């Protein structure tokens, strides 16, 4: 399902996510919901819980301890609303236990990305993508700059690009 829930700001997006997910849950009637990560779409936890559908949160327990970060707010809401929290690391599990979550409902699974990378490692190593993009191994870096504090402000984005250019020089 494509939710088409983008809003003019975080609050509007979250509201649209809740409404759209509730409609999907009504139509599909799933036995459980798996929520992955900490983006605004993880607020799917709210309509699922309202419909008494069990929620599993994968990537639970991650913390930056900065409540100014929207994803940190989302993490805490989802972690404390989900029925079962699936953590990628021991430290993430420990954070949730310190926050009072029951140990039997906080399960360390490890990172599925590690499994994917391990599975495809030989194909990655044989890939000609560096050649096709005219890149030298060790002479480039990849940046994920999707956080709103980095990209929603032209000033912040320009500073980020300037910093990356300085590192690359």
Kindly label every feature range from the protein language model.
Residues 1-16, 20, 24:
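Conserved nucleotide-sugar phosphate-binding/catalytic loop shared by glycosyltransferases and other
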Residues 3-6, 36-37, 58-61:
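Short beta->alpha connector loops at strand-helix junctions that form conserved
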Residues 24-31, 135-136:
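Glycine-rich phosphate-binding loop signature in dinucleotide/nucleotide-binding domains
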Residues 34-51:
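An aromatic- and histidine-rich active-site surface loop
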Residues 48-61:
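Active-site proximal beta-strand in glycosyltransferases
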Residues 164-169:
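A conserved nucleotide-sugar
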């Amino acid at each position: 399902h494509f939710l088409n829930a983008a809003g003019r700001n975080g609050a509007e997006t979250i509201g649209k996510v809740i409404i759209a997910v509730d409609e999907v849950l009504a139509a599909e009637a799933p036995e459980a919901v798996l929520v992955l990560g900490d983006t605004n779409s993880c607020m799917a936890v709210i309509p699922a819980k309202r419909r008494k559908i069990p929620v599993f949160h994968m990537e639970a327990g991650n913390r930056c301890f900065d409540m100014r970060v929207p994803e940190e707010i989302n993490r805490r809401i989802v972690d404390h609303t989900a029925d079962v929290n699936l953590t990628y690391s021991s430290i993430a599990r420990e954070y949730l236990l310190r926050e009072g979550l029951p140990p039997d409902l906080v399960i360390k699974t490890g990172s599925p990305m590690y499994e994917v990378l391990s599975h495809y490692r030989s194909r990655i190593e044989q890939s000609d993508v560096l050649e096709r993009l005219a890149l030298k191994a060790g002479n480039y870096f990849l940046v994920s700059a999707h956080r709103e504090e980095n990209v929603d402000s032209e000033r912040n984005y320009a500073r980020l690009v300037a910093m990356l250019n300085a590192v690359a020089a």
